[in-house]
């Protein structure tokens, strides 16, 4: 997952570089993401934590496109108490990733909204894997012309019973 995540981020940066020569506005942002799984409601397990990378291209003063890549993970150690000692039973891991695209709408120099849709992947213990439709929305603030602050939400459903909600906050550079 780490190798694939690194490759996708590198590929996104590589593909975005020629676009930077155009006169239009671009924003690249990076931040924190946290995924909550509905199946963990009554569990001691923690939410998945990771990162979010976004690239925004504005066609004109109002409309643009946004691409988003999210990767979160959690690894849990399993222990049992046997014969007065604590024994490690192994570990479980959950990986979540999404790649989404969608339109952006700029209300003024400071506030933009966006919606996006794409594909998400969830993997349990490197064995059980499923792809699913993902969708999301977010708001982007530009407190100054070259800085963006983004708050996002995305959702998906896996294995017909596991709902995911991913929340993200990122900071970006607008050029």
Task: Please state what every model-predicted region is.
Residues 1-25:
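Cleavable N-terminal export/targeting peptides
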Residues 28, 49-53, 97-101, 133-137, ...:
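Hydrophobic, lipid-facing positions within transmembrane beta-strands of outer-membrane proteins
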Residues 28-34, 67-71, 115-119, 151-155, ...:
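Transmembrane beta-barrel strands of outer-membrane/channel proteins
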Residues 26-28, 61-67, 110-113, 141-151:
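Repeated loop/turn-to-beta-strand initiation elements of outer-membrane beta-barrel proteins
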Residues 34-47, 70-95, 119-133, 159-162:
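Flexible, solvent-exposed loop segments that connect beta-strands
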Residues 20-73:
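Short glycine/proline- and aromatic-enriched beta-strand/turn motifs that initiate or cap beta-hairpins
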Residues 27-29, 105, 137-142, 146, ...:
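Outer-membrane beta-barrel "beta-signal"
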Residues 19, 56-61, 104-109, 143-145, ...:
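Outer-membrane beta-barrel proteins
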